[in-house]
UniProtKB/Swiss-Prot annotation:
Signal peptide: none annotated. GO terms for molecular function: RNA binding. The gene is matK. This is Maturase K. Belongs to the intron maturase 2 family. MatK subfamily. GO terms for biological process: mRNA processing; RNA splicing; tRNA processing. It comes from Cubanola domingensis. InterPro entries: Domain_X, Maturase_MatK, Maturase_MatK_N. One of its GO terms (cellular component) is chloroplast. It comes from the Eukaryota. Keywords: Chloroplast, mRNA processing, Plastid, RNA-binding, tRNA processing. Disulfide bonds: none annotated. It is found in: Plastid, Chloroplast.
Length: 505
């Protein structure tokens, strides 16, 4: 029972933080700008500086102080005197600052509540870094996969209600509604009958991504908790848990009932081999369960979203596949279970035997076709993978050309260092190296062969950053045995900041 209480624990003392006064502080917009700028350095987005002007922020804050109240005209939004003519620009500026402010309660939850306590109250938090241990799991004993397309069309009021559970500040929620209405009235593509946001991964607005993730984590936290108690997840027994407004009030009483009445029988339904992971708009369940059990999971999830979160979900958005015949696609990797044969020679007295063993192993491979497509789109090669020159960079100096190509090559090697087989990665690096040579030869009006012959074999050393050198920097005190063991597969936790070219979607 203590474990369940700890899992569902909510720090109620942090529910009443008032965020609305922070909206009128200029430094909040500076912090939001710096935060987004730092994240965009590796993404090579030089135009971001032009999206925020402190003069605009000062004018906006002055208007916010002078405005007594927000008036939203349902039928005539163009008469709104608060935003004036620069409606889209002001809405975008407020959205950037508000998205930074509304994340504060979630950051606070990562800080220990009292000094001297090293335990972080983050039991319900999820991270993209959970993908790495998922790909390192042993799937040899599992056989079924549920591919789930998470519902992404969400009504505006549902998003506000989700934040209401964590942010007890009515003024901030009213401002959020105001921003939603302004976005709705200003966006010509939103003239549909139903007011809802389509949270597709292609949208880059920070506020929309944050609201989408908070919405997903809202039902994911309940779903994961219920999954830990029973693999069948009978909604008749746990339905009262899903009334989120009174969730933490009822939790103490229900945990006692649960511990007394259900603990004795739930062990029969537990599935200790269930693995769960979420990435972008898709979640995956890998289990040892039978097809009948996976079908129960499928229809439970559909009813779970429809009945308790007001999301219309069709059963066709949940796919059941067999793991040996299925490929998982996460963070630019293609992962699948392969049979790796191994032969062992055994000798007994004068007789020797050859024993063939086939071991199941999850291989993470570099998707060569999508990567070549990305390189072709960026004009490094054609659709067949043949390297071509980059005319747009021919006007740069030789060192700048080599630096740009070398940075892309290093990013790709860094990103796909977790691949179990790097043959495809070597081919991609070859394409980039030859494209660099053709670009330099084009600049000097020479052929590639003559250009390389003149410079010698030491040319393009920027591309020859071997994994042993990377390991020596990452693990300077590691022994040679340690480096040899981990040379084939390394996960870097900062790959989510790498250039868009490495994300081969």
């Amino acid at each position: 029972m203590e474990e369940i209480q700890r899992y569902l624990q909510l720090d109620r003392s942090q529910q009443h933080d008032f965020l609305y006064p922070l909206i009128f502080q200029e430094y909040i917009y500076a912090l939001a700008h710096d935060h987004s700028l730092n994240r965009s350095i590796l993404l090579e987005n030089p135009d971001y500086d032009n999206q925020l002007s402190f003069l605009i922020v000062k004018r906006l804050i002055t208007r916010m102080y002078q405005q007594n109240h927000f008036i939203i005209f349902a039928n005539d939004s163009n008469q709104n005197t608060f935003l004036g003519r620069n409606k889209n620009l002001y809405s975008q500026t407020i959205s950037e600052g508000f998205s930074f402010i509304v994340e504060i309660p979630f950051y606070i939850r990562l800080i220990p509540s009292q000094a001297g306590k090293g335990i972080l109250k983050s039991y319900n938090l999820r991270s993209i870094h959970s993908l790495f241990p998922f790909l390192e799991n042993n799937f040899s004993h599992l056989n079924s996969v549920l591919d789930i397309l998470i519902p992404h069309s969400v009504h505006l009021e549902i998003l506000v209600q989700n934040l209401r559970y964590w942010v007890k500040d009515a003024s901030s929620l009213h401002l959020l509604r105001f921003l939603f209405h302004e976005y709705w009235n200003c966006n010509p593509l939103s003239a549909t009958k139903k007011r809802g946001f389509d949270f597709s991964p292609k949208r880059s607005q920070r506020l929309l991504f944050f609201l989408y993730n908070s919405h997903v984590c809202e039902y994911e936290s309940i779903f994961v908790f219920l999954r830990n108690q029973s693999s069948h997840l009978r909604s008749t027994s746990f339905g009262v848990f899903l009334e989120r407004i009174y969730f933490y009030v009822k939790m103490e009483r229900l945990v006692e009932v649960f511990a007394k009445d259900f603990r004795a029988s739930l062990w029969l339904f537990k599935d200790p081999f269930m693995h769960y992971v979420r990435y972008q708009g898709k979640s995956t369940l890998v289990s040892k369960g039978t097809p009948l059990l996976m079908n129960k999971w499928k229809y439970y999830l559909v009813n779970f979203w429809q009945c308790y979160f007001d999301l219309w979900v069709h059963s066709g958005r949940v796919y059941i596949n067999q793991l040996p015949n299925h490929t998982l696609n996460f963070i630019g990797y293609l992962s699948s279970v392969r049979l790796n044969p191994s032969m062992v020679r055994s000798q007994m007295l004068e007789n020797s035997f050859l024993i063939n063993n086939a071991i199941k192993k999850l291989d993470t491979l570099v998707p060569i076709i999508p990567l070549i497509g990305s390189l072709a789109k960026a004009k490094f090669c054609n659709l067949l993978g043949h390297p071509i020159s980059k005319p747009a960079w021919a006007g740069l100096s030789d060192s700048d050309i080599i630096d740009r190509f070398g940075q892309i090559c290093r990013n790709l090697s860094h990103y796909h260092s977790g691949s179990s087989k790097k043959k495809s990665l070597y081919r991609i690096k070859y394409i980039i190296r030859l494209s660099c040579a053709k670009t330099l030869a084009r600049k000097h009006k020479s052929t590639v062969r003559a250009f390389l012959k003149r410079l010698g074999s030491e040319f393009l050393e920027e591309f020859l950053t071997l994994e042993e050198e990377v390991l020596s920097l990452t693990f300077p005190r590691a022994s040679s045995t340690f480096r040899g063991e981990y040379r084939s597969r390394i996960w870097y936790l900062d790959i989510i900041y790498i250039n868009d070219l490495t994300n081969s979607q």
